[in-house]
């Protein structure tokens, strides 16, 4: 079965996400692989694919801040901290927020926080809007290999049958910057 999704096949991607599958899609800099953040089965599949330990935690990517609110606690942010976050969104900056106790450990790992981003990539915005929630999102690459920047690279690393939403990345050279929403501390340079 060929699961490659032609560009614009958002409905097919949503169907695969609803079936707890992991899919690949273009983001601002590289292709990402993602899944339903509320499905432990889907997240376990993603972690196995990436050979990533669950304790490292994951990133959620969303079309809007509203989609992220069930997973984070922004109540302790000051007006200045909130402004610093919203000045960067939508865009390629990921912020680490406190996470409420209801956020699943398969997302937060060993942390009491969660990394989240509101994307400005039009295809991912459309995908998250059609799905109605954020996606777990991590770079599309197998352990020890560079992140994929094209559909062809995704197919080379993950196989011809891996479901790929075809499209172009946003042209950025580096993955998203990661900052603490409370302190502004830089965890990863973008």
From Swiss-Prot:
One GO term describing the cellular component: cytoplasm
Domain annotation YrdC-like: ranges: 7-190
Main subcellular location of this protein, as a coarse class: cytoplasm
Places the protein is found: Cytoplasm
Pfam families: Sua5_yciO_yrdC (PF01300)
Gene Ontology terms, MF aspect: ATP binding; double-stranded RNA binding; L-threonylcarbamoyladenylate synthase; nucleotidyltransferase activity; tRNA binding
UniProt keywords, alphabetically: ATP-binding, Cytoplasm, Nucleotide-binding, Nucleotidyltransferase, Transferase, tRNA processing
Enzyme Commission numbers on file: 2.7.7.87
Enzymatic reactions: L-threonine + hydrogencarbonate + ATP = L-threonylcarbamoyladenylate + diphosphate + H2O
GO biological process: regulation of translational fidelity; tRNA threonylcarbamoyladenosine modification
Source taxon at top rank: Bacteria
Class in the EC hierarchy, top level: transferase
Entry similarity comment: Belongs to the SUA5 family. TsaC subfamily.
NCBIfam families: PRK10634.1
Role played: Required for the formation of a threonylcarbamoyl group on adenosine at position 37 (t(6)A37) in tRNAs that read codons beginning with adenine. Catalyzes the conversion of L-threonine, HCO(3)(-)/CO(2) and ATP to give threonylcarbamoyl-AMP (TC-AMP) as the acyladenylate intermediate, with the release of diphosphate.
Name of the molecule in the record: Threonylcarbamoyl-AMP synthase
Organism expressing this protein natively: Salmonella typhimurium (strain LT2 / SGSC1412 / ATCC 700720)
Recorded name of the encoding gene: tsaC
């Amino acid at each position: 079965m060929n699961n490659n999704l032609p560009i614009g096949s958002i409905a097919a991607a949503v169907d695969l996400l609803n079936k707890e599958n992991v899919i690949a899609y273009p983001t601002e800099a590289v292709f990402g692989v993602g899944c339903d953040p509320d499905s432990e089965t889907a997240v376990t599949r993603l972690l196995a694919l990436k050979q990533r330990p669950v304790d490292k935690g994951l990133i959620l990517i969303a079309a809007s801040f509203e989609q992220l609110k069930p997973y984070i606690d922004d109540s302790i942010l000051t007006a200045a901290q909130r402004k610093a976050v919203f000045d960067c969104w939508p865009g390629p900056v990921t912020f680490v927020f406190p996470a409420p106790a209801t956020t699943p450990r398969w997302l937060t790992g060993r942390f009491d926080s969660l990394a989240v981003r509101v994307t400005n990539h039009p295809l991912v915005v459309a995908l998250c809007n059609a799905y109605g929630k954020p996606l777990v999102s991590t770079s599309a690459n197998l352990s020890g290999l560079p992140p994929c920047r094209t559909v062809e690279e995704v197919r080379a690393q993950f196989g011809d049958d891996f479901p790929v939403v075809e499209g172009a990345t946003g042209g950025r050279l580096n993955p998203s910057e990661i900052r603490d929403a409370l302190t502004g501390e830089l965890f990863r340079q973008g």
